Each structure stands twice: as C-alpha cells, then as structure tokens.
C-alpha cells in the first residue's frame, strides 16, 4: 500500500518514496532498511559534542556528558535517498568508530548489553535548503520527509535519537479523501 498523509484539506498519496525503488516501508528506517543491499552509506562526520540540556534529559545522563554525533548519507543506485543525524551518549560506546558505523543500531546496542525493544518515530513533510539539499541532490525548497526517531530499550530509556531526512518522489495529491463516506 502507498503511504498516505493528510495535508490541509486533501490527502497526499506517495506512490514511491525513492527513484531507487526502495519500498515505502523503508521510511520506518528500521534495521531492515539499513541492511538493504541496494543501500550504501557515506560517512559525513563522526564527532563528540557536549550534551545540551534537552539531550541530557532525553538520554538521562549528566549535563556535562558527551554525545556521539554521526552524520551519514544513504545512497542507492548512486542517488542520495536519505541523510541521517544520530546522537547517543559517548559513555555507552566510548570506542565508537567509523568501522562500528557499519553495524545496524539494534545489533550494536545489543552487543553492549543494551538490547533495544522498539523504535518510536514521527514523520512530517518539510522543505529542504542549503547543504542538506545539496547532499540529497535535490533543488532548494524541494519537499522531503523528516523522521524524528528514538530507539528505546525495554525500560523505555532512549538509546539513540536520530533525525532522518528522506527524499520524497512522485507525489499525487487528491483534492478529496478517496475513502469518503
């Protein structure tokens, strides 16, 4: 089924998310999305940053803690399909490296005795500008999907917080709800 989203007085039906023919379910960005053999990642940056108040509260760590910030671009058939910005406390995986970036998040945290139980995510449509438009290989002001995602442990502790920008392709707008009564 295509992904549907209400927008104003109409319903947008997104027939295909990516020209690279990745399934709409991929927008969930779960472990299966990142293990898709059609995808390859390009590391943009990997750095430690100080945790701001909101992030230290989100991860339940001290306010002077450091976070890993990972930026990467996901490519399929030489086309950018998504940008990922992920945060997690550096004290949980102090030896995080470019090599460990290749391991799916679920497996990485499970190896560190912090098995994830679920992913919570909100998705909204946005317009992309500047560096992010360049990295996604789209025109400034083009539409994209922004997924705010949290990987949670069984005790509801947030293990990883990510912002994922994904290209939207081939959108059809219906002026009337096709499921009208």
Regions found by a protein language model. Give the residues of each.
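A short glycine-rich, His/Asp/Glu-containing loop-to-beta-strand
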Residues: 39-44, 70, 76, 80-86, ...
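Exposed, interaction-prone assembly regions rather than primary DNA-binding/catalytic cores
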Residues: 58-61, 66, 71-72, 84
